[in-house]
Amino acid sequence: GPSAEEVMEGKEAPQDQGFLEEWLARCQEIIDKYQPDILWFDNGINSRSLDPLKLRLAAYYYNRAAQWDKPVSLSTKHDAYLYGTITDYERQGRAPKDITSHYWQVDEPIGNKFGYIEGLQIQSSSQIISKLVENISRNGNLCLNISPKADGTIPENQQEVLRQIGHWMKINGEAVYGTHAWMVYGEGPT
């Protein structure tokens, strides 16, 4: 079978029909049980050979959303889904450098790792807010990953950064929610 690296990079994926049907059934169960606003797949479904299965999932999800009268989105790494979904870039450095015609997002950890480790170095609220604003100005978004401890608690230093971001959003939310990219990135009044 394929190596883990091949699966993660989308070069190959498990082709066992039983596995694929179970994956689809589990996704459908999550959709029905929780009515998520967004389905986000980190990796593992990038292979073009899985397109028929991914189309079945997308149809199921979007049809359910129509029944709920609710807008929803699909997001995946790379180009696992076709145009119309939200492309996800891991970490800010991989984000588009110019305005795009499609929506996208960056999944960015609050610290230097996605998971919790003792002594985790975290970003300041200013650094995170700058990334958020930068992404919005190019038609993107920021999916901020927090790093809770094994017992589920969020360390105080991360909580403080989240509170600071929340305070900034309370004051400046109008400049974030419902906005869109300008015609030329970096152009316009400051």
Which residue stretches match the model-derived regions?
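Mature catalytic domains of secreted/periplasmic carbohydrate-active enzymes
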Residues: 1-190
